[in-house]
Each structure stands twice: as C-alpha cells, then as structure tokens.
C-alpha cells in the first residue's frame, strides 16, 4: 500500500492511499523460489468421474495433497542441454557462450557442465565514423 498526503506546505490534511503491486523483481524472485520447490503430482479420478477430482503428490511426503500455494507439475521438463527431436530442442552443444556473463549466454548455463574452449578473435570492419572539426 502506498499513500500520498495532500495539503498546504506538505501538511497531511487529506491522505490518499492505494494498493500497489510489488516490484517486478520481487515477483520474479518469488516465482523462482516457487519453481525451485515445485512438486510433481498425479491426477486422481473419483470412482465415476472422468475429470480428476484432486491432485496428489507423485512422491508422497507428509501429506498426500499439495498445498494450495505450491507450484505443481505433471510432466518433467525436458533436458534442454541435449538434442531431443521429440520436443524440438536442438540442445546447447556447439553454441557460443560468454565466459564472464551471468546471464542466459553464460558458459556455466549453456555448457551444462561439459566444459568449454576459449579463443580470441579480431574482427575488422567499417566503423562508419565521421570526423567533425569543431574549433
């Protein structure tokens, strides 16, 4: 919730408050935490029901049903490191990576623990520069 005061010289004779969403980064961190703690479930059908009546944990822990706040999944995610024609994933083998990056192009993420070779290269080309005499 955020509030703003209205009044002469900053006095708070009238206060307006409204509900706001959390910052985008906070939402991202919360979703990532949920993703890392997601649980695999399977659908359970009632005796005469075609539609599943509830979900239960695939690997039971203390209780057999996931909490309402749990992030759940039915199928495991494919391994995007390896080529998989069934899912259309081309894998990451042979991709260029950035050794110093911490983003999606980092060698740590793209190489999937296989290691990587480093090399340097020089690129020459037109810079389309212009010289302007100013003084």
From Swiss-Prot:
PTM comment: Palmitoleoylation is required for efficient binding to frizzled receptors. Depalmitoleoylation leads to Wnt signaling pathway inhibition.
Localisation: Secreted, Extracellular space, Extracellular matrix
UniProt gene name: wnt7c
Entry's Gene Ontology BP terms: canonical Wnt signaling pathway; cell fate commitment; neuron differentiation; positive regulation of JNK cascade
Organism in which the protein naturally occurs: Xenopus laevis (African clawed frog)
Recorded family membership: Belongs to the Wnt family.
Protein name (record): Protein Wnt-7c
MF GO annotations: cytokine activity; frizzled binding
Lipidation (O-palmitoleoyl serine): 9
SMART domains listed in its UniProt record: WNT1
